């Protein structure tokens, strides 16, 4: 029996501090200019390399229990057994317990190692658990495609690869959950095999999706073009807390781009110029002042989405009323987030929002990730 190699990599969620849509390109994509940041909230991506001949790359979505890392130990056992015995891994449960009380997850006031800030007992459910069963399978799954792309580019035969994802980052949220999972696969494999430079890894990532190059390294970055031209920016001051809320609605990203294109055609559209939002954010980041960063947060899709889902503006107003330095939509939604300079203020805001929003979570902004 071949020896198995078991790799685990964190896949951190992202937020848009700004998102400027500059116009449609000839290739059908839109030129973007935006500032993005990483948060501690993350999925765990586990890979098992090495299996008998005929065990091809496979994938299974799992649900991360917010209270424990036991899922990873189970994942390692199940994946090793699947590859060595050539059997199917048991199906993951469709739901997980709600966010649990402090007694189950450690001392209040300590950020857990999964990037979640412990909160008091609540009936709030985790949308990651509800959506894990809906993750694309086979070639439709970006993490599996990332593994295959890496092996193809490196000319490596891993002797089989099993990919399993423990979901925490909500799906269809504008937090690049799928792209982050793919980036985590590329990072984990490159740490193990060391086949590529950072630049080459970005090229492989861009072939998978526009957000993957950013998600490879994360941190605070200016992204331009489709999102592939990246410029590292100063980290936010210590103590940048985030409240995430995900209302119960869904939107079509192509439809939002279409509506935004029409809005921009109006004579009164964007009087400040197409890049003014991001320019203001760059000035705030260089100054290193968290209140200025909060005040500069902006997203071109927010006014478009507000026409279809008024709860977006309602959540932003409530976050600001609870002390957020700024509140904005990330990506094309549906997560709205507030920036706070204190965990106590963030938790008070989260408690207020939980009465009306099905998913509320507290986390922190994190620095860039190293690949080597």
Predicted regions and their residues:
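Residue-level signal for inorganic ion chemistry
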Residues: 17, 45-47, 143, 178, ...
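Glycine/threonine-rich beta-strand-loop-alpha-helix active-site module
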Residues: 194-233
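ATP-binding N-lobe of GHMP and related small-molecule kinases
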Residues: 1-173, 191-195, 236, 246-249
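Conserved, helical-rich catalytic subdomain that frames metal- and/or nucleotide-binding sites
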Residues: 217, 222-326, 341-344, 351, ...
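Conserved glycine-rich beta-strand-loop-beta hairpin in the small C-terminal domain of fold type I
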Residues: 334-335
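Phosphate-handling active-site elements
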Residues: 152-164, 188-208, 342-355
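DPxDG-like acidic metal-binding loop motif
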Residues: 143, 173-200, 214-216
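Solvent-exposed alpha-helices and their adjacent loops that cap or buttress functional pockets
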Residues: 2, 37-38, 155, 206-207, ...
């Amino acid at each position: 029996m071949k020896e198995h190699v078991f790799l685990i990599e964190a896949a951190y969620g992202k937020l848009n501090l700004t998102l400027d849509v500059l116009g449609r390109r000839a290739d059908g994509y839109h030129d973007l200019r935006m500032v993005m940041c990483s948060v501690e909230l993350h999925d765990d991506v586990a890979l098992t390399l090495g299996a008998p001949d005929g065990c091809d790359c496979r994938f299974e979505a799992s649900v991360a229990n917010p209270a424990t890392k036991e899922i990873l130990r189970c994942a390692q056992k199940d994946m090793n057994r699947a590859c060595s015995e050539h059997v199917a891994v048991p199906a993951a449960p469709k739901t997980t317990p709600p966010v649990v009380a402090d007694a189950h997850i450690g001392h209040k006031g300590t950020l857990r190692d999964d990037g979640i800030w412990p909160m008091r007992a609540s009936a709030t459910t985790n949308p990651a658990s509800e959506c894990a069963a809906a993750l694309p399978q086979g070639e439709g799954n970006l993490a599996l495609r990332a593994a295959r792309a890496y092996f193809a580019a490196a000319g490596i035969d891993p002797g089989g690869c099993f990919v399993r994802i423990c979901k925490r980052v909500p799906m269809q949220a504008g937090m690049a959950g799928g792209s982050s999972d793919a980036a985590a696969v590329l990072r984990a494999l490159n740490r193990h095999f060391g086949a590529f430079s950072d630049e080459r890894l970005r090229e492989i990532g861009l072939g998978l999706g526009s957000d993957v190059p950013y998600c490879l390294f994360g941190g605070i970055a200016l992204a331009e073009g489709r999102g592939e031209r990246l410029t590292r920016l100063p980290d936010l001051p210590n103590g940048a807390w985030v409240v995430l809320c995900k209302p119960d609605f869904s939107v079509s990203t192509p439809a939002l781009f279409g509506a935004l294109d029409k809005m921009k055609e109006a004579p009164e559209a964007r009087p400040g110029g197409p890049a003014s939002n991001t320019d203001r954010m760059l000035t705030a980041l260089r100054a290193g002042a968290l209140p200025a960063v909060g005040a500069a947060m902006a997203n071109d899709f927010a006014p478009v989405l507000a026409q279809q889902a008024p709860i977006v503006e309602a959540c932003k107003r409530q976050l600001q009323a609870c002390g957020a330095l700024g509140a904005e939509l990330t990506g094309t939604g549906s997560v709205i987030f507030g920036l706070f300079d204190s965990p106590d203020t963030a938790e008070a805001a989260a408690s207020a929002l939980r009465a009306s929003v099905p998913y509320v979570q507290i986390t922190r902004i994190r620095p860039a990730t190293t690949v080597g």
